[in-house]
């Protein structure tokens, strides 16, 4: 059994449902410390994080490439639906089954073994290697990567390159890498009316009727046209609530929850201003609370994307596509202290599902891609 596969199995066997790390990080830290990494645990409100760095011969003057990822996994769902226990690594039909196999314990194992092989082959490597690992990516993500980034920023630590081990591939290993993600912003809108008897509408104000024209305009609005890297910004309603449950009462308020997924072609302030303008134009009496869970980030083609492209081609023969689709990731936090952030990992078809798995034939090639990038950028 390869070193990467063995470590993957060890990590899967630890039931690290978010935010409980179950000592996955300690297992990684022990391996990294043996290589000479300086390892620091940064805990916050029950979340376990660590930052590890091995300086190269150039010290802080050299480039720093960090691997970022998460040890936490999503809950298993109904255990009886799994063909094998989710935290017992199981081989079947050339695949390794277990919660976290694809998202993202194989990537974590690949990071560690790639670093081990690289340091053994290049003991005098010029650049530095970092690890930024959290147990709070699948949860609220309020005490995980963002806390490590804040700590690193406070001490003036800057990363030059970062590979996030998210499962970005689709049909085969290496066909898709993510060089950015859209931002996410939600709004909680309450439109005020006047409750009353449904037979006497002149004595009430129906907030649903008042909201409807504005809602139609918001849904039809073209927020931007996107750009070379991002599709157009989208606005979607997630929840609409009103009424008492009775059929003869006009409600006193209507509550609307909505979300923007926005590109670098729009700004938080610009989108908020346009929403308020539409609501004001329709004369609504309302309150609106905003929450921004992530800003968009983008890594244009450059040293990291070129190195990853070359490594994937050499290892798999696949020509990767750069993409910014999908939801948010911890890359949005890391981009604050790192100009080049790219996500790359195994196929994602089974992530978060019953019988999550990875094709065993992809395990070592994934590790080899990570090692090749180290060799190209910091050897």
UniProtKB/Swiss-Prot annotation:
Residues at which Zn(2+) 1 binds: 70, 103, 166
SUPFAM superfamilies registered for this protein in UniProt: Bacterial exopeptidase dimerisation domain (SSF55031), Zn-dependent exopeptidases (SSF53187)
InterPro entries: ArgE/DapE_CS, Bact_exopeptidase_dim_dom, DapE_proteobac, Peptidase_M20, Peptidase_M20_dimer, Peptidase_M20A
PANTHER family linked to this entry: ACETYLORNITHINE DEACETYLASE, N-ACETYL-L-CITRULLINE DEACETYLASE
Provenance organism: Burkholderia mallei (strain ATCC 23344)
EC number in record: 3.5.1.18
Single GO BP term: lysine biosynthetic process via diaminopimelate
Keywords: Amino-acid biosynthesis, Cobalt, Diaminopimelate biosynthesis, Hydrolase, Lysine biosynthesis, Metal-binding, Zinc
Domain of life: Bacteria
Residues of the active site: 72, 137
GO molecular function terms attached to this record: acetylornithine deacetylase activity; cobalt ion binding; succinyl-diaminopimelate desuccinylase activity; zinc ion binding
Protein encoded by which gene: dapE
Pathway info: Amino-acid biosynthesis; L-lysine biosynthesis via DAP pathway; LL-2,6-diaminopimelate from (S)-tetrahydrodipicolinate (succinylase route): step 3/3
Cofactor(s) this protein requires: Zn(2+); Co(2+)
Keyword Flavoprotein: no
Co-factor binding details: Binds 2 Zn(2+) or Co(2+) ions per subunit.
Function: Catalyzes the hydrolysis of N-succinyl-L,L-diaminopimelic acid (SDAP), forming succinate and LL-2,6-diaminopimelate (DAP), an intermediate involved in the bacterial biosynthesis of lysine and meso-diaminopimelic acid, an essential component of bacterial cell walls.
Pfam families: M20_dimer, Peptidase_M20
Family named by the database record: Belongs to the peptidase M20A family. DapE subfamily.
Residues that, per the record, bind Zn(2+) 2: 103, 138, 352
Descriptive protein name: Succinyl-diaminopimelate desuccinylase
Signal peptide segment: none
Subunit structure: Homodimer.
Reactions the enzyme catalyzes: N-succinyl-(2S,6S)-2,6-diaminopimelate + H2O = (2S,6S)-2,6-diaminopimelate + succinate
């Amino acid at each position: 059994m390869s070193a990467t596969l063995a470590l993957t199995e060890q990590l899967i066997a630890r039931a690290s449902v978010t935010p409980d790390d179950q000592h996955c990080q300690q297992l990684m830290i022990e391996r990294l410390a043996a290589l000479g990494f300086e390892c620091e645990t940064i805990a916050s409100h029950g979340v376990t994080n660590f930052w590890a760095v091995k300086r190269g011969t150039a010290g802080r003057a050299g480039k720093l490439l960090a691997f970022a990822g998460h040890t936490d996994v999503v809950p298993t769902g109904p255990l009886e639906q799994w063909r094998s226990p989710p935290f017992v690594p199981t081989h079947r039909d050339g695949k390794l089954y277990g919660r976290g196999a694809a998202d993202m314990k194989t990537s974590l194992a690949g990071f560690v073994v790639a670093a081990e092989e690289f340091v053994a082959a290049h003991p005098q490597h010029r650049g530095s290697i970092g690890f930024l690992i959290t147990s709070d990516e699948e949860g609220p993500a309020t005490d995980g990567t963002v806390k490590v980034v804040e700590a690193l920023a406070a001490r003036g630590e800057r990363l030059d390159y970062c590979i996030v081990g998210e499962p970005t591939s689709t049909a085969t290993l290496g066909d898709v890498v993510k060089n950015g993600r859209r931002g996410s912003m939600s709004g909680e809108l309450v439109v005020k009316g006047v409750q009353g008897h449904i037979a006497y509408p002149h004595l009430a104000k129906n907030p649903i009727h008042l909201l409807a024209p504005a809602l139609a305009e918001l849904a039809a609005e073209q927020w931007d046209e996107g750009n070379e890297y991002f599709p157009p910004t989208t606005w979607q309603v997630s929840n609409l609530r009103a009424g008492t449950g009775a059929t003869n009462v006009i409600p006193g308020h209507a509550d609307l929850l909505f979300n923007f997924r926005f590109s670098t072609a729009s700004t938080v302030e610009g989108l908020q201003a346009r929403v308020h303008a539409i609501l004001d134009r329709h004369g609504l009496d309302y309150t609106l609370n905003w929450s921004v869970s992530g800003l968009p980030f983008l890594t244009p083609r450059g040293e990291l994307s070129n190195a990853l492209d070359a490594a994937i081609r050499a290892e798999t023969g696949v020509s990767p596509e750069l993409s910014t689709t999908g939801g948010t990731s911890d890359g949005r936090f890391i981009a604050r202290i790192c100009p080049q952030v790219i996500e790359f990992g195994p196929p994602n078809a089974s992530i978060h599902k019953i019988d999550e798995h990875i094709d065993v034939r992809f395990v070592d090639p994934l590790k080899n891609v990570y090692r090749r990038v180290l060799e190209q950028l910091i050897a």
